[in-house]
Amino acid sequence: MATLLLRSQRLHRSLRHRTRPTVDVLLRAASHGARLLYPDHIPTTPLQKMLLAAGAAGMALYNPYRHDMVAVLGETTGCHTLKFLRDQMKKDPEGAQILQERPRISLSTLDLSKLQSLPEGSLGREYLRFLNANKVSPDTRAPTRFVDDEELAYVIQRYREVHDMLHTLLGMPTNMLGEVVVKWFEAVQTGLPMCILGALFGPVRLRAQSLQVLFSELIPWAIQNGRRAPCVLNIYYEQRWEQPLTALREELGISPPPKHIQGLA
């Protein structure tokens, strides 16, 4: 299991090194001499953000699995929403602790052996099961680059890194239908423009059977849970690995997922 995740990590790093310079080179001259607020920061003007957002939106809609484009879209359109989410975190004791301590979810911070040793049904064990079953790695989340505020940059980075945790909480797979359902939940929870766009336009690639289930059952379920649950960014998941997943769902007001979701795509 750990070997699978490490292989995914190496593959992502290889792809990232090949694709990332494209954007960096285009903006390096414009940002030369500007003050960098965090290691991967690329300062951009409002016009540059608008152009980046337009291009990223087109690519993300064409191929929703282009996580790099989804990331750019989120960073260039979500400034006001990120401020609201940051303020929500500051008002909550657990959220404020997260903002202060800045935990990261990656292969370098996760103790895979410990997660594997946790009881069946615990958050940590189920999260690891999700990663393994779907062949995904927490290291596939792109670093924040285009947010011109160090604290807000962490907020959107945290949102990205708990995305797979939301899949685990909601019981959603990583196929297109599962991603759309999670996007509806995230859209209600966060209000981020990229989540709203993903929720609205993601269904265009689904089959008729999946669309019927999506609109009749899954979207209402996701909206209801998104409204009922407190801000999911205020959950210090790393301190709750041993908590039973069912207990955490009850605490957050998240009802069990529909059982037939796994057979659809």
UniProtKB/Swiss-Prot annotation:
Record: transit peptide: 1-29
InterPro entries, per database record: Coq4, Coq4_euk
Compartments where located: Mitochondrion inner membrane
Pathway: Cofactor biosynthesis; ubiquinone biosynthesis
Membrane topology: Peripheral membrane protein
GO biological process assignments: ubiquinone biosynthetic process
Quaternary structure and interacting proteins, as annotated: Component of a multi-subunit COQ enzyme complex, composed of at least COQ3, COQ4, COQ5, COQ6, COQ7 and COQ9.
Gene encoding the protein: Coq4
The protein's name in its UniProt record: Ubiquinone biosynthesis protein COQ4 homolog, mitochondrial
Reactions the enzyme catalyzes: 4-hydroxy-3-methoxy-5-(all-trans-decaprenyl)benzoate + H(+) = 2-methoxy-6-(all-trans-decaprenyl)phenol + CO2
In-chain residues carrying the UniProt-annotated modification Phosphoserine: 108
Cofactors named for this entry: Zn(2+)
Role according to the record: Lyase that catalyzes the C1-decarboxylation of 4-hydroxy-3-methoxy-5-(all-trans-decaprenyl)benzoic acid into 2-methoxy-6-(all-trans-decaprenyl)phenol during ubiquinone biosynthesis.
A GO CC term assigned to this protein in UniProt: ubiquinone biosynthesis complex
